[in-house]
Amino acid sequence: VSDTGDFRAGDVLSVACPFTPARVERAVTWGCISVRWPWWGIDTGSDFARWNGIVALGVPGSGRSAPEAEAELFRTDPPPERLGAGDICRVGVPPTMVHVTAVDHHDPPLESGWLPRPRLTVSVLRRGLSYREYPDESHLDGTGYSIHPGDGIPFTFELLLRPYASLQPGDEVADAAGRAWRFDGPWDWTAFDGEPAGAGPEWPLVLLTRAGTPCTVEDAEAVAASTASGSHRKTVRDWMSLTRASPTS
């Protein structure tokens, strides 16, 4: 997985960011520690967003922290409780398993108040957290913790699991029970017979179309091979076992 946008809902990733020196602007207050951000510049040309160069990082397990703090990826070294205003620390992301809940592309780039302006937002939650724990009215907007690959923060990503990796959003398939489906993500299946999705498609699957046109023999063989054994239910179970979370729909 790279910064160019090869992310899908359902992906399980290991994400990391090298620890970089930063100045503490405010010690832990109401579950957050505020630091002068070492990666972004202030977007003085923005007409809509203003940013002062400071980022408040959630401190999980800090007692009064909001639920959003539990989703925080960034950590400080030394730990937040040992830091005060004016101290120099290091901030980064140790290798952390996350699952992707949503992917949004921005054209034109998002006016966020900082530079470079984000072209991509990937919402993630750490292992053990499910999107249902962060309702739409929360700061996380029902999806998760937002990162912006390609925005200057030197994230690295390792793809650990991609359910239905042989399929692409928009693919149309037929299942072993004779039902036709549209695939828009591992947890987003639409049956063309209008009936509820129920337990999902019955394996093996036959690829019918890709990008609205008849599929190639090679693509059809890849889908058939990847669904020759196992089941949709097993795919969900394996994903939940790895992430310790619930699917996003």
Identify what each model region corresponds to.
Residues 4-17, 80-99, 167-174:
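Short coil-to-beta transition motif at edge beta-strands of beta-rich domains
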